[in-house]
């Protein structure tokens, strides 16, 4: 499958088989992640691969979002000692997000299912991981990628909508709006 087909095929998989993923495949996902671009080649990322069911369950109990039955998870973190400083200090979020997208695409190309669950900037979501994963304060968990063999199939798609595309400059137009999620507006 070519890259465009892989992008359309990539979907958030929420149901996984109990079958474990070989360590070599998990390392291939990390190698794909580190092929992502970073601002000034800073590479501020750290990856924690978790295959221990007890640890996965504890993380699922403590984090706010996503509680999936995948046999593996990759916690993608930004290391502030490696991140840029000054007005571009938050570029680590973009860098690590690009790495996560590479993991998702690589997983799809390998017939694995995956889903990205965001942690940062919701402190109540990422803070519990510090103790569980022995993280130093300068390492911030950005997100979790659950990975496994899919137990569900979803049709390939794109969410392209020409109402969100502009040529040369932004124009005021009527857009679809999203209902406010009161869960996060407290």
Show which residues each predicted segment covers.
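Acidic, surface-exposed loops and disordered segments
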Residues: 1-186
